[in-house]
Amino acid sequence: MSSCSRTRLSRALGVPLTPKAARLMEVRPYPPGQHGRFRRKGDSDYAVRLREKQRLRGQYGLREKQLASVYHEARRVKGLAGENLVEMLEMRLDALVLRAAFARSISQARQLVVHRHILVDGKLVDRPSYSVSPGQTVKVKPKSVPLDPFQVAASGGHADVLPPIPGYIEADLEGLSFRLVRRPKRSEVPVTCNVQLVVEYYAAR
């Protein structure tokens, strides 16, 4: 997806998906289109749930099939489906690379993984959907450390566009490594979404 498309999607969903989108939404905090400034009236329950599902999907950069698959897995686990869903999404390797401030956006985090720059417990992992377990250590491959994106990360260059590193991650930015110390709690995860509406969306299908 192009930068322009992500910015337009950010405005439509009401959540910034990239740093560029965040800057634009400060100036235009309403959906794109001629009638964007006006509040949408008469949205059906389905439309509200659909929009919330799209917000969650957009923040993790997933295709519909991917999000639906994680939801069905979350339902099979003991506990609340919505909380399980966010926890599972947050433990994806690409999501954690973003949360640890190694990247500026979820799309960049995914590229870093796919391009084989990331090690988990010393082994190369190139699957963004890889589920990191508590106690595992993630670091940048030594040969990749000199690359510009990682030098920016090591200097704390993404701090201006990202929320603080959450408590479930123990990060060493200078060393370009981090450890998932425990499973994340929904209240700690910096995503904007009413997860219950997402659960209701899938439950009604």
From Swiss-Prot:
Gene Ontology CC: small ribosomal subunit
GO BP: ribosomal small subunit biogenesis; translation
CDD domains on file: S4
SUPFAM superfamilies linked: Alpha-L RNA-binding motif
Keywords: Ribonucleoprotein, Ribosomal protein, RNA-binding, rRNA-binding
InterPro entries, per database record: Ribosomal_uS4, Ribosomal_uS4_bac-type, Ribosomal_uS4_CS, Ribosomal_uS4_N, S4_RNA-bd, S4_RNA-bd_sf
A UniProt-annotated Pfam family: Ribosomal_S4
GO molecular function annotations of the record: rRNA binding; structural constituent of ribosome
Coiled-coil region(s): none
Domain of life: Bacteria
Span of domain S4 RNA-binding: 91-149
Family according to the record: Belongs to the universal ribosomal protein uS4 family.
Known function: One of the primary rRNA binding proteins, it binds directly to 16S rRNA where it nucleates assembly of the body of the 30S subunit.
Subunit (UniProt): Part of the 30S ribosomal subunit. Contacts protein S5. The interaction surface between S4 and S5 is involved in control of translational fidelity.
Name recorded for this polypeptide: Small ribosomal subunit protein uS4
Species this chain originates from: Tropheryma whipplei (strain Twist) (Whipple's bacillus)
